[in-house]
Amino acid sequence: IEDKLQDGVPECISSLRKGGIKVWVLTGDKVDTAINIGYACQVISPDMKVIQLTSNAKGISLEVDKDGIPTQMCLNAVLAKALAEGEKAVKDGLEVVAVLDTYFLTSIEMYGKGQDLLKLANMCKSFIAARVSPDQKGQIVTLVRNNSPDTVVTLAIGDGANDVNMIQK
């Protein structure tokens, strides 16, 4: 079974991004699927710097606990590298997209690194979280809403029961 994008979705998202609106995708899909969808709907463009914080990312040496969650030391190193890459890309005039998976999001929550995640997200034009649970979707929306200036407006849109928690936040 293949999910197809509805007509006009890529153009709509492209217009939102051109208008300065950051688009976040929070999905239960696998990382590769989420990235492919990101390209298909223009959340990611070919000229963007993709910063991937996922358990299968190239160039990331993971030290994980028994549940596959990155350890605090590993998380600190990966976040520091991601922040440095993001800053360099922005300085070089590139747009940035961050791609995270459930394991990194769990580690960020466990070790209280939400502010670092927001710092990275603020550099990004787009943000993709893959393999996330309904609870994690809600936590991400809450994190952004609770730590953004009053001038920031957030909108959560979903098409299934797994999106209810996020939408209610």
Region locations from a protein language model:
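Cytosolic catalytic headpieces and adjacent flexible linkers of membrane translocases
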Residues: 1-151, 155-157, 164
